[in-house]
């Protein structure tokens, strides 16, 4: 069976709350670090989430 090219990543809140989302991304088409604006329920507002490796 073929190995998928999508890699699991963690999106960590830049607000410093420790909240994170997990998702996958295609390493071949998007080699740069991902940054998304998503909702952080701890601070109850939308903040920037930055990509980090899943350990």
From Swiss-Prot:
This is Large ribosomal subunit protein bL33. GO terms for molecular function: structural constituent of ribosome. Belongs to the bacterial ribosomal protein bL33 family. It comes from Klebsiella pneumoniae subsp. pneumoniae (strain ATCC 700721 / MGH 78578). Keywords: Ribonucleoprotein, Ribosomal protein. SUPFAM superfamilies: Zn-binding ribosomal proteins. The keyword Ribosomal protein applies. GO terms for biological process: translation. One of its GO terms (cellular component) is cytosolic large ribosomal subunit.
């Amino acid at each position: 069976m073929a190995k998928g090219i999508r890699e699991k990543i963690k999106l960590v809140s830049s607000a410093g709350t420790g909240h994170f989302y997990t998702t996958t991304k295609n390493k071949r088409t998007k080699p740069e670090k991902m940054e998304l604006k998503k909702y952080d329920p701890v601070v109850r507002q939308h903040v920037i989430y930055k990509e980090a490796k899943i350990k």
